[in-house]
């Protein structure tokens, strides 16, 4: 959805029934963080009038059955998880000469004279929402440098899963091994830093220099530099929003049929966090440069109702990728979101979804995160050759 401030959202299925979404309340603080959104709690209700806050980019896949299979666009946080994240969230370090590494490091060389773009202090039309920049805390199940937010009833043993190899075999033989695509192709970012976000500004764009396609381009470059075959499919799937996951599924299947060597599919998204009074910008500093925090999502199908029987194989890849991202910088990656949903991750045993920043991160920050993620992905895949 384009705006956060709607109290009630009406969603129509093919049968025309109107359903309400119930979500959690917004936690308000009076200190560094004005508020942190409680993410969307996916519940289909009838005859109830619960206050609803929606996340930008929400999409209902076509039909109620698909809703149960794919879930909603954004996963949710429980009240206790939000409270803990807010209590442990930290401010983003200032960028100074001392924060810039003196050695060539992952994603950026010190020889690069990085200069961030000038901030935009323009006062736009509409309601102004202060942008709260923070590092989202690693809250959840922990093992070494891996943190998982487990929203399922599965008793996850991270160490045990790491002991099993993913069902992915990578070859550097010139054939496509990875497919990068975007279910919500229009999810976009800010051109430059802003103190406030305005209700008149768009959170979606067809400009490939400002939306998630730009992030996919950075990941693609890293894979190509490493000699790993990759296809970056930029098909628009979210116009209209309804049925986007159905259309991206068709794109995946077309690419798999044309290129059966593909082992891994990555659905690159942009997240959205905030409430009635603020927008959250998850950011960290790596090698003296701001990067948007990212989040990997891996699905679960405990009762077999989602048609995702091999979810554990996908999780094993996700955990290794999470670990390699954390090896770059612990604050680079938010907790892995292990959730009761499918999101087209049943396409292959190496299918995952990754969220880059939010709508108030800059395109510069998320492109840098795409480079860093690309490095972690290369390292993960090269270990599976």
State where each predicted segment sits.
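Active-site-adjacent mobile loop/cap segments within catalytic or ligand-binding domains
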Residues: 332-385
């Amino acid at each position: 959805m384009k705006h956060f401030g709607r109290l009630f959202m009406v969603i129509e299925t093919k049968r025309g029934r109107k359903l309400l979404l119930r979500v959690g309340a917004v936690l308000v603080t009076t200190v560094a963080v004005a508020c942190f959104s409680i993410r969307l709690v996916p519940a289909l209700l009838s005859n109830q009038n619960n206050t609803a806050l929606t996340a930008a980019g929400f999409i209902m896949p076509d039909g109620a059955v698909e809703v149960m299979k794919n879930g909603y666009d954004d996963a949710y946080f429980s009240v206790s998880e939000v409270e803990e994240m807010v209590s442990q969230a930290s401010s983003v370090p200032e960028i100074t000469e001392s924060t810039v590494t003196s050695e060539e490091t992952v994603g950026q060389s010190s020889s690069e004279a990085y200069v961030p773009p000038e901030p935009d202090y323009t006062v736009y039309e509409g309601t102004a929402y202060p942008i709260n920049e923070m590092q989202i805390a690693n809250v959840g199940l922990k093992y070494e440098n891996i943190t998982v937010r487990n929203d399922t009833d599965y008793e996850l043993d991270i160490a045990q899963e790491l002991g099993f190899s993913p069902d992915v075999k990578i070859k550097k033989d010139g054939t496509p091994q990875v497919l990068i695509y975007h279910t919500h192709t229009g999810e976009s970012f800010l051109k430059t830093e802003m103190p406030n976000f305005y209700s008149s500004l768009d959170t979606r764009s067809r400009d490939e220099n400002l939306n998630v396609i730009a992030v996919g381009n950075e990941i693609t470059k890293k894979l190509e530099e490493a000699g790993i075959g990759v296809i970056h499919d930029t098909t628009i799937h979210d116009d209209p929003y309804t049925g986007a996951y159905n259309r991206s599924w068709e794109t995946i299947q077309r690419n798999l049929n044309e290129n059966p060597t593909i082992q891994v599919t990555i659905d690159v998204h942009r997240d959205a966090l905030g409430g009635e009074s603020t927008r959250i910008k998850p950011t960290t500093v790596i090698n003296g440069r701001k990067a948007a925090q990212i989040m990997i999502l891996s699905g679960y199908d405990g009762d077999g109702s989602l048609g995702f029987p091999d979810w554990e194989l996908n999780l094993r890849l996700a955990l290794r990728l999470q670990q390699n991202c954390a090896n770059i910088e612990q604050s680079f990656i938010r907790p892995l979101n292990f959730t009761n949903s499918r999101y087209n991750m049943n396409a292959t045993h190496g299918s995952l979804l990754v969220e880059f920043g939010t709508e108030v991160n800059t395109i510069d920050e998320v492109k840098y995160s795409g480079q860093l993620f690309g490095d972690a992905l290369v390292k993960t895949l090269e270990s599976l050759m």
